[in-house]
Design a protein with these regions (language model features):
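Non-catalytic signal-transmission and effector/linker regions of two-component phosphorelay proteins
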Residues: 1-66, 130-137, 141-220, 227-228, ...
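Conserved phosphotransfer microenvironments
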Residues: 10, 39-42, 46-51, 62, ...
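Short, charged/polar "capping" segments at the starts of alpha-helices
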Residues: 37-40, 121-125, 183-184, 285-288
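Hydrophobic/aromatic residues positioned on beta-strands within the core alpha/beta folds
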Residues: 116-118, 280, 300
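As written
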Residues: 127-138, 289-297
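Terminal, compositionally biased segments used for targeting/anchoring and flexible tails
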Residues: 285-409
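Nucleotide/phosphate-binding sheet-loop regions of phosphoryl- and nucleotidyl-transfer enzymes
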Residues: 378-498
Length: 498
């Protein structure tokens, strides 16, 4: 079994979520004629719709949209406001949207530009003769406000990708698709699913502040539109790929290759036998290739394609509950909702089921998808081939969870929850008021112990504070008011009477 020193080295470094997603889009300039801008707004303002979408997904910092329809108005806004993104909507009236975009790119090369086009044959034909190289992405407006949220999140993910992966090991979902209409439909569904899942796993945080920060650790979604672009991303971040979703037909070597996606599957699978792969194609015959490389298959022609994709992503990429299955029948053996439940059942899981999951890196992938990077990184390295002892694996998983939970509880003032407070909980409060002097002092010492890892280096000695639950001042006030005790407490009565 691994030495205590190695366990300490791997677990006791907390994840600094506060340093993630530092680059944000706050102001968006929308270049569109009045009719197209109205079409986006439909029955309400864009700002209002985006704000509502952000609130529904527990997201903060919704961007502000500014709409202009002429080059003069665009320059006036750019001179007075710092914009983080420009969205251009080419209309059917042959307006000079692309000319405005080119002028903006020349003057402000650091601002990303995106094309958002209504689905019409006239505009599509016109775009074929335009130079779109200045644009980050081209999207097709299908009447869903979710697309605007997806555009913003896709750009933010791209801006923060390299830093966040290097900082804490954030995971990446690689989507490879060249059909504008198709990825304009898939991305909103994929983002909504991932953001909803991040809301779920954030509930394991110990207080509201940590919940908000932990959502920054969600997997990022990255869009590639050619084989070369996909391979560049995979080569650079292959140790942080949560899964790959690929079309079958897209450009490779400068020409459309009907087997590009199959070749990508083969290359990725040759390097990683465990990473989840999904092949989505309108050609059902490609299902054979999906099976060959251990990939799931999604039929693009299916009316419930988005539902099928969401279910496969949930099962294969480690989202949702962890379901232990019988390897022969794939029937459910046990289900865990959170880390504490996994800790409680790990010794009761049948050997065959546990072997099935650990030999495929399912446990580490589940932890990665929930932004629990320290134990995920450690367990990913403990392969079945290197250990080949099922009981040792149980103990290592258990010890990893215990050490991680202890580390996360230390130095944090948690909100008391009866179903979560156990022997590994450290400091919790009941109420929203002040901790008081004694409680604050204990919380401070606990925080200092967590900051100074040298306290763990003393043999046969552990530096900790007593396990503590603090009743905040508002709970005390409520108790005094409910029982009408203030009149007695503040009177001149002697101590025995009080």
């Amino acid at each position: 079994m691994l030495s205590k020193l190695k366990l300490n080295q791997l677990y006791f470094k907390d994840t600094s979520f506060v340093n993630l997603m530092t680059k944000r889009i706050f102001n968006v300039l929308l270049v569109a004629n009045p009719y197209d801008a109205f079409m986006l707004e439909d029955d309400g303002r864009i700002d209002e719709k985006i704000f509502n979408e952000y609130m529904n997904l527990s997201l903060r910092y919704p961007p502000r949209f500014t709409q202009v329809s002429t080059e003069e108005a665009a320059w006036k806004q750019l001179e007075n406001t710092t914009f983080d993104l420009v969205i251009c909507m080419p209309g059917s009236d042959n307006s000079d949207t692309f000319e405005i975009a080119r002028s903006i790119k020349e003057q402000y090369p650091h601002i990303p530009l995106v094309v958002l086009t209504p689905f019409s044959h006239g505009i599509t034909a016109r775009m074929e003769h335009e130079d779109l190289s200045i644009f980050e992405y081209v999207f097709c407006w299908l009447g869903n406000t979710d697309l605007l949220v997806s555009i913003i999140k896709l750009i933010e993910d791209k801006m923060n990708l390299e830093h966040d992966i290097k900082e804490v090991g954030v995971q990446m979902i690689l989507l490879v698709e060249d059909s504008i209409r198709f990825y304009s439909s898939v991305l909103p569904n994929l983002y909504k699913f991932v953001l909803k899942q991040s809301q779920e796993f954030a509930t394991e945080a110990l207080n509201a502040h940590q919940r908000t920060l932990r959502m920054r650790g969600r997997p990022k979604i990255v869009l590639a539109r050619t084989y070369e672009e996909a391979m560049d991303l995979y080569n650079k971040y292959q140790n942080n790929v949560l899964g790959v979703i690929t079309d079958a037909r897209y450009p490779r070597g400068g020409v459309v290759d009907p087997m590009a996606g199959i070749k990508l599957l083969a290359e990725v699978r040759s390097r990683d036998p465990f990473v989840p792969l999904i092949l989505q194609s309108a050609e059902v015959d490609n299902k054979v290739y999906a099976s060959r490389y251990g990939a799931s298959f999604v039929d693009k022609n299916s009316k419930k394609m988005n539902i099928d994709l969401r279910e496969i992503v949930s099962d294969d990429f480690g989202f949702g509950d962890f379901i232990f299955r019988n390897p022969d029948t794939l029937e459910e053996v046990a289900r865990v909702h959170n880390l504490k439940e996994l800790q409680n059942v790990i010794f009761a899981i049948p050997k065959e089921s546990l072997l099935y999951h650990i030999s495929r890196n399912h446990v580490s992938r589940w932890l990665y998808s929930r932004a629990m990077f320290p134990p995920a990184e450690f367990l990913k390295q403990i392969t079945w081939e290197s250990l080949q002892d099922i009981d040792a694996h149980r103990r290592i998983i258990f010890e990893a969870i215990v050490k991680y939970r202890k580390m996360k509880n230390q130095g944090v003032v948690a909100v008391f929850q009866r179903d979560r407070f156990d022997r590994y909980s450290n400091f919790a409060r009941i109420g929203e008021g002040s901790l008081g002097g004694k409680g604050r002092g204990l919380a401070f010492i606990d925080n200092m112990v967590k900051r100074h890892v040298e306290f763990d280096e003393f043999e046969n000695a552990t530096v900790v504070i007593p396990k503590t639950v603090v009743l905040c001042t508002d709970i005390f006030d409520e108790f005094m008011d409910t029982n009408s005790l203030y009149q007695v407490a503040l009177s001149d009565a002697d101590d025995d009477t009080i």
